[in-house]
């Protein structure tokens, strides 16, 4: 029983049998302290503790002496930790002992103290144990002090770990205001000794402090300082003041070396150094915010390899760089430290790419290694894209149903539901979790084709038919057909993989270049030239191109909720394929074939668009640039030409600069849509896409004898967007309705043109329309509003749903409909009937599809059946791709000095060459649009073939003829070649360089593509779809004589 008149501390002192230290212990410790190099500091700590009088005075000496002499903390701790902080740590430990004594329970040390500028955590240390309390502490520190935690699967943590957590465990990554401007510094130490003789508990101590950086330059703005700091490498300018003062010269030298390297890189810098006998120092530097959960994942990695940390540090720098320094030792002393540390350093790069996923439990339970579990994650995401389909059955039923649109619509809905219900993402994941032994077999197969090590001769030669024995193993192992299909899809991934950066030492995302032979020709009638698959911790995406020389935009796909994310993830490849295929059709007039890239942001990383884009581009460049670490089974040079699309317009400058930094010779042409100062031609500023779309509107009205000013028009895509704003600016019609991101703006009497023109000039949403300028029948319904009463008395329950479906609403009727925005397949078989009036007529007699894939092909055909005139996207909106193609041509034809002088706008001064080049681009766009419009109109008049089909037939014929021309002897005719290239190139470029210099500078495959596309398109537009070989011969003879 405790004496109620004594404090707990006094009680302990009064009962020698329960003391943690005997008098003999104290004497021995005092003798040890005499030779301790930190004796003076210990004396100061004793003085502090005695002055606070929280520990019984007779206990201060042995407690402090044990802490310094027996606990076994690294000397770095005493060098870098202030005496007052050490005193608090000793007091915390003593408090734990008092609680243990008072309760009679086993000594459990779970201590944490926090204030605004620092925090301390002390916990038992059990190296290599998954259930160690230290693991929970590190997760909490990572989330709340580094701002980079993301623990997707809370089942990874035991109830005991959650119970001792110093904070609530959140599965979400920090975003927005939750992310502190700089993470905390961390010093972590593991004791080699125990708490006392009677309690053999080793401890791990975490000490966190806010960094204090040197003051920023006072005469610069905050944004300018941030810009300068991002590239600053001098530790004395960007390091914490205490770090600079107290770190050893060796540490500063190592940190300076990695800092110099990491600032110019996208990914991490990982190095290791020998430390004492059979120890190693692992140093990792990376840009903060570029990954998540990295700190805890690195700990799990070295635990997997039977290593533990004696002490470790996290240092933050004001330029945004974080550096880890981890001192490792093997759990078993006979282990070769060199082999272990090399393996850890090698895999740390892979951990950076995918630190934590739903498959991480397979790694933590040692069922799979980290490379194996990373491979499994990639295969899971890949297989999911190509399993959710019933191609054979669907084709058979669709053929049996025939032209019955209602039944076709029902069949399409049934197929979608069956596919999603059968192969959900979770269903595929569960199969992977159930059969890790199959993943091991498939990974070994993957490794032997793509890991070269030090000898490239070790790798197997590419063989798309390999793996029959693996297929047999799959069928023997799994117990149902669905799982068999899943693992067969993974084997197909292996079989068709031509190159990957998986084994490249530094990378930011995993990228894979695939032969498209794995695609079903029933589902994907046109086979692409190449498919790239890119996976990062914040995203996954594809890049698809239909020709070697191809160009297309990169699209960020965001998801507002889990339902939308499920839809976006299941349709990711199909959306990418359809966009690229449409691009291929519309690119028939230009040198590049069609391509498209998509980046699907992960559900919990919707704010990481820029980080995801950077990694996506870096991953693609890994496979485009020569690298001895990558086994290249394709063995041909490749170039991608990229452009802006949804969510990426602001990133084109960076992508071009990054390609230059990485040594890509094609850097100027790598991206279009760059800023004026970088020689870009912004589509929105010059209305490039709209210029093509509007030619179809004007052409149709001219054929019908209508005056544009007398026609009503409805458009999706508002005055804040590229197409929407320029459609308002260029048109002279009576616009009655606009739908954009803010809501629905409608006035049957016609919207005030001055007012919508004002919004278009300022690029403002429709919600900023002056409502006083609406007629009594006019209204605006905001997406955020509910239960809104319209002028006709109808009640709008949800503004968001009203906006999403307004193009299908009977209130919306006009002579012309120009979709300038909206999601793909907004009109399809399941809802196209809503486009018609009660008498079966189209609510929009004229439709020019400005937005890509707004209608499905079957929906277009049904609309045409009702008598409407519709021109599909591949024909109507090709102005943007024409502009981008000519932007690429200028970048390839001009050398660096010429490009800077003639194409880059500086200080708002537009070079004369640039102004004239824009005029030439406008002329080319309008000419191409008029030629195709006239061809489609003429063919429809003579054959009655639907215009939507004619558009495809034209593209197919031109593209097919282009391919034939490029492989024919026509290319060898020097005179013809010069003549065609002269006709195809902008006049101002010809005047500057001359045709011979253009042909000399531009890569031959690109020149050949210009030659073929120009010849093929001009012939087909002139002679039509039914032209024969004799007509082509006549055409060629005419050209040669001109």
Swiss-Prot record:
Q: How is it modified after translation?
A: (Microbial infection) ADP-ribosylated at Arg-763 by the Legionella pneumophila effector Lart1, which inhibits the glutamate dehydrogenase activity. Amoeba are natural hosts of Legionella, and ADP-ribosylation by Lart1 may promote Legionella parasitism.
Q: Extract one GO BP annotation from the record.
A: glutamate catabolic process
Transmembrane segment boundaries: none
Give the residue range of the signal peptide: none
Q: Which UniProt keywords apply?
A: ADP-ribosylation, Cytoplasm, NAD, Oxidoreductase
Which superkingdom does the taxonomy of this entry point to? Eukaryota
Q: Any idea of its EC number? A: 1.4.1.2
Task: Describe regulators of its activity.
Answer: Activity is stimulated by AMP.
Q: Which reaction does it catalyse?
A: L-glutamate + NAD(+) + H2O = 2-oxoglutarate + NH4(+) + NADH + H(+)
Instruction: List the Gene Ontology MF annotations in alphabetical order.
Output: glutamate dehydrogenase (NAD+) activity
Q: What is this protein called in UniProt? A: Glutamate dehydrogenase 2
Q: Which organism is it from?
A: Dictyostelium discoideum (Social amoeba)
Gene that encodes the chain: glud2
């Amino acid at each position: 029983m405790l004496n109620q008149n004594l404090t707990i501390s006094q009680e302990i002192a009064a009962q020698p049998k329960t003391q943690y230290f005997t008098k003999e212990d104290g004497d021995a410790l005092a003798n040890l302290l005499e030779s301790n190099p930190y004796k003076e500091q210990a004396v100061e700590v004793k003085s502090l503790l005695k002055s606070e009088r929280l520990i019984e005075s007779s206990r201060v000496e042995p407690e402090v002496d044990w802490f310094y002499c027996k606990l076994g903390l690294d000397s770095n701790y005493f060098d870098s930790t202030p005496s007052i902080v050490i005193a608090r740590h000793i007091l915390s430990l003593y408090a734990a002992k008092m609680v243990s004594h008072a309760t009679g329970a086993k000594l459990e040390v779970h201590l944490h103290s926090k204030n605004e500028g620092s925090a301390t955590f002390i916990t038992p240390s059990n190296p290599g144990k998954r259930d160690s309390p230290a693991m929970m502490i590190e997760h909490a520190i990572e989330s709340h002090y580094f701002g980079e935690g993301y623990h997707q699967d809370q089942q990874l943590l035991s109830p005991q770990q959650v119970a001792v957590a110093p904070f609530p465990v959140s599965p979400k990554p920090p975003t927005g205001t939750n992310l502190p401007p700089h993470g905390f510094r961390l010093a972590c130490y593991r004791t080699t000794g125990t708490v006392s003789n009677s309690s053999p508990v080793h401890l791990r101590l975490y000490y966190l402090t806010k960094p204090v950086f040197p003051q920023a330059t006072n005469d610069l703005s905050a944004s300018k300082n941030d810009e300068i700091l991002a590239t600053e490498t001098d530790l004395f300018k960007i390091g914490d003041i205490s770090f600079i003062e107290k770190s050893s010269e060796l540490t500063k030298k190592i940190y300076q070396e990695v800092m110099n390297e990491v600032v110019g890189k996208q990914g991490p810098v990982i190095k290791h150094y020998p430390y004492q006998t059979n120890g190693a120092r692992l140093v990792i530097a990376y840009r903060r915010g570029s990954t998540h959960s990295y700190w805890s994942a690195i700990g799990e990695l070295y635990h997997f390899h039977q290593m533990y940390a004696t002490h470790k540090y996290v240092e933050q720098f004001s330029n945004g760089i974080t550096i880890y320094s981890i001192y490792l030792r093997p759990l078993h002393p006979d282990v070769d430290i060199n082999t272990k540390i090399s393996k850890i350093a090698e895999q740390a790069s892979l951990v950076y790419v995918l630190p934590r996923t739903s498959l991480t439990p397979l790694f933590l339970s040692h069922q799979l290694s980290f490379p194996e579990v990373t491979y499994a994650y990639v295969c899971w995401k890949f297989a999911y894209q190509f399993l959710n389909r019933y191609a054979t059955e669907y084709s058979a039923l669709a053929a049996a149903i025939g032209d019955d649109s209602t039944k076709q619509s029902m069949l399409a809905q049934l197929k979608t539901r069956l596919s999603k219900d059968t192969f959900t993402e979770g269903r595929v994941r569960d199969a992977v979790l159930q059969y890790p032994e199959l993943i091991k077999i498939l990974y070994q197969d993957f490794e032997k084709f793509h890991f070269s090590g030090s000898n490239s001769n070790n790798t197997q030669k590419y063989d798309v038919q390999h793996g029959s024995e693996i297929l047999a193993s799959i069928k023997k192992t799994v117990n149902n057909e669905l799982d068999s299909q899943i693992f067969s899809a993974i084997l197909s991934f292996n079989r068709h993989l031509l190159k990957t950066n998986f084994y490249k030492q530094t990378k930011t995302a995993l990228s894979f270049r695939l032969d498209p032979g794995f695609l079903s020709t029933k589902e994907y009638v046109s086979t692409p030239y190449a498919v790239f698959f890119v996976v990062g911790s914040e995203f996954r995406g594809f890049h698809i191109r239909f020709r070697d020389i191809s160009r297309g935009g990169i699209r960020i796909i965001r998801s507002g909720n889990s339902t939308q994310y499920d839809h976006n993830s299941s349709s990711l490849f199909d959306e990418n394929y359809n966009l690229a295929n449409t691009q291929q059709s519309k690119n028939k007039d230009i040198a590049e074939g069609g391509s498209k890239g998509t980046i699907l942001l992960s559900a919990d990383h919707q704010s990481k668009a820029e980080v995801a884009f950077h990694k996506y581009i870096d991953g693609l460049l890994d496979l485009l640039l020569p690298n001895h670490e990558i086994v290249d089974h394709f063995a041909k040079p490749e170039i991608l030409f990229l452009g802006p699309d949804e969510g990426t317009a602001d990133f084109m400058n960076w992508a071009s600069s990054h390609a230059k930094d990485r040594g890509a010779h094609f850097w100027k042409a790598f991206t279009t849509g760059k800023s004026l100062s970088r020689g870009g031609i912004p589509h929105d500023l010059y209305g490039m896409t709209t210029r093509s779309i509007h030619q179809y509107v004007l052409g149709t009205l001219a054929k019908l004898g209508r005056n544009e000013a007398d026609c009503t028009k409805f458009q999706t895509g508002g005055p804040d967007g590229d197409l929407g704003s320029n459609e308002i600016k260029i048109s002279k019609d009576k616009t009655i309705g606009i739908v954009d991101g803010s809501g629905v703006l409608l006035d049957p009497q016609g919207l005030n043109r001055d007012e919508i023109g004002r919004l278009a000039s300022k690029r403002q949403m429709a919600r900023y329309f002056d409502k006083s300028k609406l007629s009594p029948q006019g209204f605006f319904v905001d997406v955020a509003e509910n239960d809104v009463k319209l002028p006709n008395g109808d009640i709008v329950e949800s503004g968001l749903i009203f906006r999403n479906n307004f193009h299908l609403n009977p209130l919306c009727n006009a002579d012309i409909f120009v979709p300038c925005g909206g999601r793909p397949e907004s009109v399809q078989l399941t809802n196209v009937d809503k486009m018609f009036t009660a008498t079966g007529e189209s609510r929009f007699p004229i439709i020019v599809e400005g937005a890509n894939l707004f209608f499905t092909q079957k929906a277009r055909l049904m609309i045409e059946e009702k008598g409407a005139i519709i021109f599909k996207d591949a024909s109507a909106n090709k102005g943007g791709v024409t502009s981008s193609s000519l932007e690429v041509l200028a970048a390839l034809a001009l050398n660096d000095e010429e490009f800077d002088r003639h194409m880059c706008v500086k200080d708002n001064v537009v070079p004369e060459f640039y102004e004239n080049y824009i005029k030439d681009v406008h002329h080319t766009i309008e000419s191409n649009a008029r030629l195709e419009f006239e061809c489609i109109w003429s063919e429809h008049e003579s054959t009655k073939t639907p215009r939507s089909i004619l558009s495809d037939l034209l593209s197919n014929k031109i593209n097919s003829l282009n391919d034939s021309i490029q492989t024919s002897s026509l290319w060898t005719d020097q005179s013809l070649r010069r003549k065609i290239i002269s006709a195809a190139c902008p006049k101002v470029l010809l005047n500057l360089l001359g045709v011979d210099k253009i042909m000399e500078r531009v890569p031959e495959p690109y020149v050949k593509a210009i030659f073929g596309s120009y010849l093929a398109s001009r012939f087909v537009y002139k002679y039509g779809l039914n032209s024969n070989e004799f007509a082509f011969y006549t055409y060629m003879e005419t050209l040669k004589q001109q």
